[in-house]
Amino acid sequence: MPKTQYIAGVSGGPDSMLLLKLYHKKIACVVHVNYNKRTTALRDQKMVEEYCKQLKVPLIVHTVPEDTVWKKNFQAQARKIRFEQFQKAASLYKVDKLLLAHHRDDFIEQAKMQLDARKRAMYYGIKTRGELYGMKVYRPFIKYWKNEILALCEEHKVPYGIDETNAQPIYKRNQVRQEIANWSKEEKEEFYIGVCAMNRVIGQKLFSLMKRAKQWLAHPDVRELKRYPLPDQRQLVYSFLITHHIDVTGDKIDAILDFIQPFQQKHYRLKDEIFLSIKDERLTLLYKS
């Protein structure tokens, strides 16, 4: 039986370089994106190139043109570029699994941003496993704190670069990261445990509802949906989208319910090129290129 193979996203930072070191025998191809946004970008690219060569792992480097016009939300635009490259590599190597190096500090950072924004999420933080853009995503480092990863890098003599912009409060995520950096180990642990407890409650409610609503999920009739209490409607719409590998926030689900109620609009945009529509009183997805 062939070994499980992955595409791996490697930036050159300690997290992803350790991922490359520990999983290189299972990696079909590494993808590195050079955004040309900072002076050390080429340094990180060369570091990834040299380490992939040393470990004998195929590498695809995507260089974003220097004259690229970046939108206000750079991080969202950069993420889209990354995943487009992951998809291309996955198609080329006929692999549907993606390895990413998010760790527990990333988890609490994401959860805090969600809570600070008062977003009603169906999951807080970052999932260890999930599906995005048609790929099965695995994040094996969620169980490790950042300082543990740095210690492992030293232990395994893993080279890495530090993105100096992470310390600059130029993005909301960076500001949250700096705030969390001042927390004690006990404060981080307490926050993490609290978020996990919230996720368990949400998951239990969702599991219970899905057991009762299998028939609706198979035939998502909007008239039947409206017979459920509003909290259940939100969970059902979320379940419908998750079965189609589309993950959205609680706020977006509320907007979807608003779209469903009057039947005034033809389509609701979920993500790039993916739209929600109502056909014969049933929810359906449209994919437009």
UniProtKB/Swiss-Prot annotation:
Coiled-coil spans in chain: none
Biological process according to GO: tRNA modification
Pfam families per UniProt: ATP_bind_3
Record-level GO cellular component terms: cytoplasm
Domain of life: Bacteria
Keywords, in A-Z order: ATP-binding, Cytoplasm, Ligase, Nucleotide-binding, tRNA processing
Primary enzyme class: ligase
Binding residues for ATP: S11, G12, G13, P14, D15, S16
Cited function: Ligates lysine onto the cytidine present at position 34 of the AUA codon-specific tRNA(Ile) that contains the anticodon CAU, in an ATP-dependent manner. Cytidine is converted to lysidine, thus changing the amino acid specificity of the tRNA from methionine to isoleucine.
Domain comment (free text): The N-terminal region contains the highly conserved SGGXDS motif, predicted to be a P-loop motif involved in ATP binding.
Name listed for the protein in its UniProt record: tRNA(Ile)-lysidine synthase
Organism: Mycoplasma pneumoniae (strain ATCC 29342 / M129 / Subtype 1)
Gene field: tilS
